[in-house]
Amino acid sequence: MSLRVQFALAQRGLDIAFEVADGETVALRGPNGSGKSTILEVVAGLLVPDRGSLELGGRRLMDLRGRGLWVPPHRRRITLMAQRPLLLPHLDVLDNVAFGPRSAGASRAESRRRARRCLEATGTEQYARRRAHELSGGQSQRVALARALAAEPEVLLLDEPLAAVDAEGSQDLRELLARLLEVRTAVVVTHDPDDARALADRTLHLEAGRIR
């Protein structure tokens, strides 16, 4: 589903406008501290800009003119996978992945069915009964990806998805991401040009608060 983003956030010096076509993956690159993660937070609904609008498939999710429109994060069908996995320590892997659909109102059984399907898709079904502290960095990142997919988002936002993975595991995860993103609308923040080429259809550059 296509995504259209336009907003300004003076505190971060951002004046942003870009579009992502249906089924397209776009990489977002720029210097450290330039605001790449902030852009994802605005799109996900975790941060309200000073002004702007956001459309997903022609449906307005944010329009800050006049009385304003702002759809909360849980109703946007947009999922953000943060740079750190942030798995819930008191839940095992299966219930971490099932947490999203369960919170959205799916039954316990349906949430777990969806979680198992996503664990299988990311090659992590064997970790279903482990806790977060029992996973390596690469395993945690794969589980976080499964959790993001279990929410069945229309747009997937990935913030440096390979940053927490060692060199040995990064190639496997890169190949997995490339395969999963083939049929999804996504925005991937990455500092690595190789990751951008492997994962994205095109690359946007953030410079001095604007997309180039």
For each predicted feature, which ranges?
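Conserved ABC ATPase signature
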Residues: 131-135, 139-141
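ABC ATPase NBD coupling module
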Residues: 61-79, 103, 108-109
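Conserved H-loop
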Residues: 183-190
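Conserved signature/switch motifs of ABC ATPase nucleotide-binding domains
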Residues: 133, 151, 182
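Conserved ABC ATPase "signature" region
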Residues: 59-64, 109-127, 178
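Helical segment within the ABC ATPase nucleotide-binding domain
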Residues: 170-182
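Catalytic Walker B motif of ABC-type/P-loop ATPase nucleotide-binding domains
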Residues: 156-160
